[in-house]
């Protein structure tokens, strides 16, 4: 009898917790988790239009909410776009919460936006900047996988027993550190027809 009561009580608690979780999820779905517009690092009209287009196609509210918040996250929070001293686009892409740029990660982070490049000149220029920055990084050290935004040694891996230049964040060679920039450059060129990225920095 007691065991049955305890089991029933446990089931009731579990049921209550599930109800609370569903309420929290429902609240979250109504909430926009993107940064305020003024705090977004890069804005693309083509990306915003794509979000609205896909929202209408997704019948599941949770999936629509996830796409709305996740698809633009790289642009909102990690892309630092500017012009270099040579006047060419230069885009440094943080890898999440680490203020360094991984060759592999940055190539994957901006990949979904390439399909929209022809609809947004600023987005196209930003993507070209990612590729040009990747080429510069590889020319600094083809055996490094992650780079700082300039010659700013951050101290994390400077004591590694390898040739650590001040521009490097990590020097842990991976074959995909070279594959991803090549993949991104080819995809960008095939999509846009823009061959200007293949300049003197090109490998």
Could you say what each language-model-derived stretch is?
Residues 1-9:
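Bacterial N-terminal signal peptides
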Residues 11-13:
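Sec/Tat signal peptide C-region and signal peptidase I cleavage site
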Residues 16-104:
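Low-complexity, Ser/Thr/Pro/Gly-enriched N-terminal "stalk/linker" regions
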Residues 99-127, 131-203:
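Aromatic-rich carbohydrate-recognition surfaces in CAZymes
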């Amino acid at each position: 009898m007691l065991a049955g009561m305890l089991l029933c009580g446990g089931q009731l608690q579990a049921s209550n917790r599930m109800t609370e979780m569903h309420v929290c999820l429902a609240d979250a779905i109504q909430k926009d988790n993107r940064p305020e517009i003024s705090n977004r690092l890069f804005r693309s009209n083509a990306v915003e239009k794509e979000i609205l287009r896909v929202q209408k196609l997704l019948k599941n509210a949770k999936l629509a909410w996830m796409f709305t918040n996740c698809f633009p996250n790289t642009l909102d929070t990690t892309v630092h776009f500017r012009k270099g001293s040579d006047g060419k686009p230069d885009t440094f892409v943080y890898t999440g919460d680490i203020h360094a740029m991984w060759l592999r990660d940055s190539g994957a982070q901006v990949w979904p936006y390439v399909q929209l490049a022809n609809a947004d000149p600023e987005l196209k220029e930003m993507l070209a900047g990612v590729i040009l920055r990747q080429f510069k990084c590889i020319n600094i050290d083809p055996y490094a996988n992650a780079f700082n935004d300039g010659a700013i040694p951050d101290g994390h891996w400077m004591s590694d027993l390898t040739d650590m230049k001040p521009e490097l964040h990590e020097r842990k060679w991976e074959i995909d550190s070279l594959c991803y920039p090549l993949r991104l450059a080819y995809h960008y060129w095939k999509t846009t027809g823009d061959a200007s990225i293949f300049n003197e920095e090109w490998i």
